[in-house]
């Protein structure tokens, strides 16, 4: 369900693209140094967005540099880190591990079991640093698994559980913005869950795999776009309530345009102009 919260690079200027990539590289650097090379390979742009988002809201000090890495051994890459980079790295590590565990549970693929084994030590360190977050992630994913075992009726329970998972990630600390951050994460999580379900609907039907939209009267996942737009609107409403100035245009690009990239590619629909 990850890989949806990405930028629409074609709509970013060169400076914004450089800024976006530097946060991604900063997160990769934190993953490698904190948890090892295998977790670094499981890096997602979703968690780079988390770093960028929290940094834009709280505006902590930044540090930056340039370095070569496993992905780019020939040329040094610019990176940016803040106080939230380590947190996002830990969440990335936990989510990657739990995702592979769930893949093993669902499909019994040896590759998933092997990946979970390699990610396990890093996830254990991340869980020791953030035990409450680790417990919340595991509980949410267990709720999703249990809800998905009932294929007899349409249910929003899995989407709600994923929404709560994302709410937990964005509520990085208790302060005046926590309720809005939880609302934002909850709405974004539900959007991601249902968007992923819409993109996978045809394939899941062929494979007789669980999909919450399979029991609805629709020919294609593209038919669910109006409902997705409502969820995207909920996330946008929460976002606009936050006093974000730094990197606001970049974040708006991701939320209002980039998040639709995979959906539009899946159904070859024309990208709507953001309002």
Regions found by a protein language model. Name each.
Residues 253-257:
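A glycine-rich phosphate-binding loop feature that marks nucleotide/adenosyl-phosphate handling sites
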Residues 1-183, 190, 194-229, 237-247, ...:
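Acidic catalytic motifs of isoprenoid enzymes
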